[in-house]
C-alpha cells in the first residue's frame, strides 16, 4: 500500500455493535443551527435529526434502531424504549446479574447512545427513502461495483436528487453521500457520517459532524479520487483527512489502521430520493419525539 501524505484535494464497514455512550440527554429546548449551504435543502433536515437524536431519548432510539422492516416514520419510540428495558431485565435474569451490570454491556434506554458508523448510515438512508410502501434495509439493497457506480455518477440527471451509502473497506467505515439536484454545471455532494474513532479516522459525533462539516460541499472528482485511491492502494492521507476529518487535520489520522484494499470490498448503494419524502419523515419524527 502506497501512502501519500501531502497531495491536497478537497473534503467510515458493516454495522458493528458498540455501547459508546454520550452524556447529553436534554429533551427540550432544542436549538438547531442553520445550514451554511444554500445549495442543499436536505442538509437542514439531517441536521435537525442529528441534533434531536443527541438530546432526545425518543429520537436517539430511532437513530439506533436496527429493525429495518418498519419505515422510520412508523416506528414508535415509546415501544422501542420499552423493548430495550424488557430485554435488559430478561438478560439480567438469564445471566444472574444486576440490571446495571447488563446496561454497562448493552447500553440503557435512559442514556443517549452514539451509534457505530454503519447504524448511522442505515438510519440516514431510511430518513431519506422510507415511505408507507418502502422501508430501506442495507441487507436487501442492490449493490454496485466501483465501475458501475462511476458509470452511474457520470450520468446522474441534474434535476434529480440521489443518496449513496458506502461501505468503505479501506477505511473500515460506512457513510452516506448526498447528491442534491443542481442547476450548476458541476455537481456538489455532501457527506454525512458518525465515527466512534476505532479505525483510520478519529471519533466524531453525528451531531458534531452535521453542524460543523456536513454543509461543506465536495465534488464528484474528489469522491472518485478517494474511491480510486483506496481501490488501487494509492493512499492520500491529506485527501482522506479533508473528506472525513471534521477539521481536515491529517495528523489526526491513524495510517496503521488502513486496510489493504480490493475493489470488491467496496459496497455502494445508490438511490434517487424525493425531498418532500424527507421533509415528511422529519415532520412525523419531530411530532413523535417532541
Curated annotation (Swiss-Prot):
EC class: hydrolase
GO cellular component: extracellular region; host cell nucleus
Keyword field: Host nucleus, Hydrolase, Secreted, Toxin, Virulence
Region (Disordered): 1-26
Major localisation: secreted
Any one Gene Ontology molecular-function term assigned to this protein's record: hydrolase activity
EC number: 3.5.1.44
Homology family: Belongs to the Cif family.
Protein's name in the database: Protein-glutamine deamidase Cif
Amino acid at each position: 500500500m502506497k501512502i501519500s501524505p501531502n497531495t491536497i484535494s478537497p473534503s467510515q464497514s458493516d454495522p458493528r455493535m458498540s455501547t459508546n455512550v454520550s452524556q447529553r440527554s436534554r429533551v427540550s429546548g432544542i436549538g438547531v443551527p442553520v445550514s451554511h449551504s444554500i445549495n442543499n435543502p436536505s442538509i437542514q433536515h439531517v441536521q435537525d435529526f442529528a441534533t434531536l437524536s443527541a438530546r432526545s431519548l425518543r429520537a436517539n432510539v430511532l437513530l439506533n434502531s436496527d429493525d429495518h422492516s418498519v419505515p422510520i416514520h412508523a416506528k414508535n419510540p415509546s415501544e422501542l424504549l420499552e423493548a430495550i428495558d424488557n430485554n435488559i431485565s430478561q438478560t439480567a435474569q438469564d445471566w444472574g446479574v444486576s440490571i446495571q451490570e447488563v446496561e454497562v454491556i448493552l447500553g440503557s434506554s435512559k442514556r443517549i447512545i452514539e451509534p457505530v458508523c454503519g447504524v448511522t448510515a442505515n438510519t440516514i438512508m431510511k430518513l431519506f427513502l422510507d415511505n408507507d410502501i418502502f422501508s430501506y434495509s442495507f441487507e436487501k439493497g442492490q449493490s454496485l461495483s466501483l465501475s458501475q457506480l462511476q458509470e452511474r455518477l457520470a450520468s446522474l440527471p441534474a434535476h434529480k436528487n440521489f443518496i449513496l451509502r458506502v461501505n468503505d473497506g479501506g477505511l473500515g467505515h460506512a457513510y452516506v453521500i448526498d447528491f442534491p439536484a443542481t442547476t450548476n454545471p458541476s455537481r456538489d455532494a455532501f457527506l454525512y457520517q458518525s465515527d466512534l474513532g476505532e479505525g483510520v479516522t478519529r471519533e466524531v459525533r453525528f451531531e458534531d459532524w452535521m453542524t460543523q462539516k456536513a454543509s461543506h460541499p465536495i465534488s464528484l472528482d474528489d469522491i472518485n479520487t478517494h474511491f480510486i485511491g483506496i481501490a488501487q492502494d494509492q493512499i492520500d492521507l491529506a485527501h482522506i483527512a479533508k473528506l472525513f476529518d471534521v477539521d481536515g487535520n491529517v495528523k489526526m489520522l491513524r495510517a496503521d489502521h488502513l486496510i489493504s484494499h480490493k475493489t470488491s470490498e467496496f459496497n455502494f448503494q445508490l438511490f434517487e430520493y424525493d425531498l418532500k419524502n424527507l421533509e415528511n419523515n422529519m415532520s412525523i419524527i419531530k411530532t413523535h419525539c417532541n
